[in-house]
Amino acid sequence: MEVSSSETLPILWRTSPPSNDYENARCRVFNGRQPEHFPLAIVKANKVEHIVAAVKLAAELDACIAVRSGGHSLSCWTIRHGAILIDLEDYQHLSYDDEIHEVQASPSTLGADLLTFLAKKKRFFPVGHSGDIGLGGYLLQGGIGLNSRGYGYACEYITGLDIITADGEIKHCDKTENSDLYWAARGAGPEFPAIVIRFFLKTCPLLPVCKRSRYVWPAAMYGKVFKWLEELLNSLSEDVEIAVFGFVLPRLNQPGLVLHATAFGDSSENVREKLTPIIKNHPPGTFLAEDFVSTNFPEDYDLGKDTMPRGARYFTDSVFLKPGIDFVATCKGMFTELKHPRALAYWQPMKTNIDRILPDMAMSIHSHHYVSLLAIYEDPSEDQQQISWIIDRMKSLEPAILGTFIGDAHPVERPSNYWSEEAEERVITIGRKWDPSSRIRGIVLSDA
């Protein structure tokens, strides 16, 4: 590893051709479909002083800054051409305050590691649906994670954070101190104008029993399945996470639907009661029916690696739909007309018997229906084809779209709104105040 004039700064400089160490560090991301962008240098920070030095180096060189936590973002925003890339993989901190049930975690902390750490204390935090998602990008983008229908968005659990500004100053942010940055940290995503070095997060009591009901139908059952679920959500326990995937049935080469209903509780009896409305009333005609199966997050994360392996090529787009639309009619094509054998459509309903009111934070787009399309493939020659069919499908939904999830924003291919109008103005104002040169921000709102 090449070292700068400061012996304490672990830095890899771009060379021509790039060194193997540089290229391995540049491409430490989940998505095999990566932009041909080359950071000016990559800093493998393992302490705060490295991060501060990297920020000051960027200012000296008039370079932008990219920050990588887990590298799971499918948009690969951290591969920013000509930037100083600060990779936080080796910058690790994880501690717990027993008195206030609060965890302190570095942005590089992976979801699976946080769950394991908290389980020993009989506590829980709603991390992402993949175990190797780092907290940094996940929380800044809002945190649509485990049972968001019941737990809400993960960013709502942020009680404070330590940050480094674009000038290299270390500050704390919470409801009373630098409250504008605290507001922005909960949903501004890549437009957050500082670098998070520590999150302070409230935790929940761990519900120790986790069971799942799983059913697979042919896509011809789409109308019956989705109408049944829409009606069911009004009375279904908030401790039940509903997820429906549209996919191509293996060997049959026809579209299918799979429902995962995952429930959490204190006992098997308690969980069975929560799943009973699904077990007893699900529509007939299934290819596969599993009424009450034990599951856990490590198993789920391992199974997820089979469907979404690291290094495959990905493209995704995710939106919230307007209240009052005919959801079943609007999304039928998404789930029944998948164009590629590994493609996935996804519905995560947020509806409960009481409408949730979001706290005052940057994350301001919310509705009962969150839907997503995902392309998974291996051949680089398919890039444009895979991107186009998803963008075209999402454009066809635009009359029904309330807003786009900031983590899957495509401001060039499909411009959208990622916050409410008022929240977007605040994101811009806070960004200009704390990062007037757009050294850190500016990926989505490039003209702000």
Swiss-Prot record:
Domain of life: Eukaryota
Gene3D superfamilies, alphabetized: 3.30.465.10, 3.40.462.20
EC numbers, comma separated: 1.1.1.-
Cross-referenced PROSITE patterns: FAD_PCMH (PS51387)
Keyword Flavoprotein: yes
Keyword Cytoplasm: no
Boundaries of every FAD-binding PCMH-type domain copy: 35-206
InterPro entries recorded: FAD-bd_PCMH, FAD-bd_PCMH-like_sf, FAD-bd_PCMH_sub2, FAD-linked_Oxidoreductase, Oxid_FAD_bind_N
Molecular function GO terms recorded: FAD binding; oxidoreductase activity
Pfam families membership: FAD_binding_4
Function noted in UniProt: FAD-linked oxidoreductase; part of the gene cluster that mediates the biosynthesis of the indole diterpenes nodulisporic acids (NA). Nodulisporic acid A (NAA) and its chemically modified derivatives are of particular significance because of their highly potent insecticidal activity against blood-feeding arthropods and lack of observable adverse effects on mammals, in particular the tremogenicity associated with the paspaline-derived IDTs is not observed.
Assigned protein family: Belongs to the oxygen-dependent FAD-linked oxidoreductase family.
PANTHER family: BINDING OXIDOREDUCTASE, PUTATIVE (AFU_ORTHOLOGUE AFUA_1G17690)-RELATED (PTHR42973), FAD-BINDING PCMH-TYPE DOMAIN-CONTAINING PROTEIN (PTHR42973:SF39)
Name this polypeptide is given: FAD-linked oxidoreductase nodO
Gene coding for it: nodO
